[in-house]
Amino acid sequence: MTSHLKKVELHCHLEGAAPPALTLAQARKYNVDTNAFMRDGVYLWKDFAEFLVCYDKVSEVYRTEEDYALLTETYLEELAGIGTIYSELIVSPDHGDRIGLGADAYMEGVSAGIRAAKEKSGIEARLIVTGERHFGPERVVKAAEYAAKSDNPLISGFNMAGEERMGRVADYARAFDIAREAGLGITIHAGEVCGAFSVADAVELVRPARIGHGVRAIEDADLVKRLADLGTVLEVCPGSNIALNVFPDFPSHPLRKLRDAGVRVTISSDDPPFFHTSLKREYELASTAFGFSDDEINAMTRTAIEAAFLDEATRAALLARL
């Protein structure tokens, strides 16, 4: 199907990519009982709120710089094995602080994993620092300040994730101003759990180059046209959207409608093992569930490289590999 195609992923949360087998090994290492959040190699949750709790439980078994290097390298090697040439990982230095590891050690572990994976397979990767909306504006601003001041060359963008129903986008706008002034690429989660208004607010108040998900924009034809006119890129994660019941099934998912309306769309996996998916599956779904041709899928991959937060020399090299 799509195994012969090069792949790019712009939207994946690092801890959300933790393979259950690795999480189980980590839990045994730290003597953590996994029954509350994992059974038979499957992460357990029922709705978005429970998903966030499960996500945090899984994250708790990754505790050291070495743990994060291992997690990062493991996921990137998985991607490289299916023909992925570039990945952006959404990471949270604030999480490093919360678990007592520290933001710097957390980021160094992740960065070491990126370097190790690149040395083995040649895969390129960058880091998107995220603030988590449900922890409030001050924490999101702190995350932006961390990203803005960091001298880590792998940090290339800033994002806001978490519980979309908490607070107004306006409450968090300062964080994005800080990141933008530092030259970081700007993306934001919107239009996933909440409707088209969430995307409209993000466009108006944050002015992002990209939007994580953004699929609920389909509910407002004028907004869809605006996204197309602006060239705003959507990081679409169909498997995640179905798993979270954003849409009931793939025939009702608007990926093709958005693309046909001129919106620039890309394909990602979000939190793959939580949603019983993978980047490989997302590309296959583009073919089987949405009916995209190889040329159309390659065009979305090209869009992802064009929209990636990275230097122009690396972008040109990646485009040459398609």
Swiss-Prot record:
Indicate which residues the UniProt annotation says bind Zn(2+): 11, 13, 189, 270
Task: Relay the cofactor remark from the entry.
Answer: Binds 1 zinc ion per subunit.
GO terms of molecular function: adenine deaminase activity; zinc ion binding
Q: Which cofactor does it need?
A: Zn(2+)
InterPro entries, A to Z = A_deaminase_dom (IPR001365), ADE (IPR028892), Ado/ade_deaminase (IPR006330), Metal_Hydrolase (IPR032466)
- Looking at the keywords, is Zinc-finger present? no
The active site annotation covers 192
| Alphabetic keyword roster | Hydrolase, Metal-binding, Nucleotide metabolism, Zinc
Query: One GO BP annotation here?
Result: adenine catabolic process
Domain of life from the UniProt record: Bacteria
Biological role? Catalyzes the hydrolytic deamination of adenine to hypoxanthine. Plays an important role in the purine salvage pathway and in nitrogen catabolism.
Alphabetical list of HAMAP family matching this protein = Adenine_deaminase (MF_01962)
Q: Please identify the protein, giving its name as recorded.
A: Adenine deaminase
Q: Which organism is it from?
A: Rhizobium rhizogenes (strain K84 / ATCC BAA-868)
